[in-house]
């Protein structure tokens, strides 16, 4: 414990996930929704920022049985969360990539008393003029530029760029290295693949998938998948 009374993380090289004593010192329990690869990255950010003591939630017991999740408290159904936390509710963070899964988990946990929190890496660059909704993941070295807007529950992954005046809808997944250029607009539940580029002013509808490395040069209607250069 430091001079100011805050718990200190274990020494460099020690697994934060495995250190139960460190978690027990954190007063707030924080539900982590998802138990896959992205959840590992979210756990690291939670622990680095001392956001709270992780409690895992995933509806697949086999996922929770794998390390590092097997070392943490966990639940597999919403009623169990309600029983544990009671009427006071609980904070949660989304820890999956898929737009559909993010939306489903968000709705399910809110329905049993959860309230969403965002996880934003300290290395991310976020403009003071950007508008960020609740329940976001903003990962390492992401850029969210001036007057950008991001809807609730979206994921901006590592080194993704949202440039000036862009608008990203709800529960979107902006994959690593993707670039959404000035004043482009994405609908809800859009997945932008790694390294893809959406050119300035382009409009992308709801439930669209943009393939990795694609360059989107024209507007995209709802519910389609586009890929290639130019994206079709």
Residue ranges of model-derived segments:
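Left-handed beta-helix
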Residues: 12, 98-152, 156-166, 178-180, ...
